[in-house]
Curated annotation (Swiss-Prot):
Membrane topology: Multi-pass membrane protein
Pfam families per the UniProt record, alphabetical: DUF1328
Predominant subcellular localization, coarse grouping: membrane
Lineage: Bacteria, Pseudomonadati, Pseudomonadota, Gammaproteobacteria, Chromatiales
Gene Ontology CC annotations of this record: plasma membrane
Domain of life: Bacteria
Listed name of the protein: UPF0391 membrane protein Tgr7_2500
Originating species: Thioalkalivibrio sulfidiphilus (strain HL-EbGR7)
Transmembrane segments: 4-24, 29-49
UniProt KW keywords: Cell membrane, Membrane, Transmembrane, Transmembrane helix
Length: 52
């Protein structure tokens, strides 16, 4: 999931430099959402991990 966030971030940067502001905005929003989902799942897995 973190890989997808990085891909959308790169797409947003490239689209922004080429002048496609709509595509850049959408790609950066998707990258932010995926990164937040990744962080939430990371915290949940750390807190709810199995303890022996």
């Amino acid at each position: 999931m973190l890989g997808w966030a990085l891909i959308f971030l790169i797409v947003a940067i490239i689209a922004g430099t080429l002048g496609f502001s709509g595509v850049a905005g959408a790609a950066s929003w998707i990258a932010q959402v995926l990164f937040l989902v990744f962080l939430a799942l990371l915290v949940i897995s750390l807190l709810g991990g199995r303890r022996v």
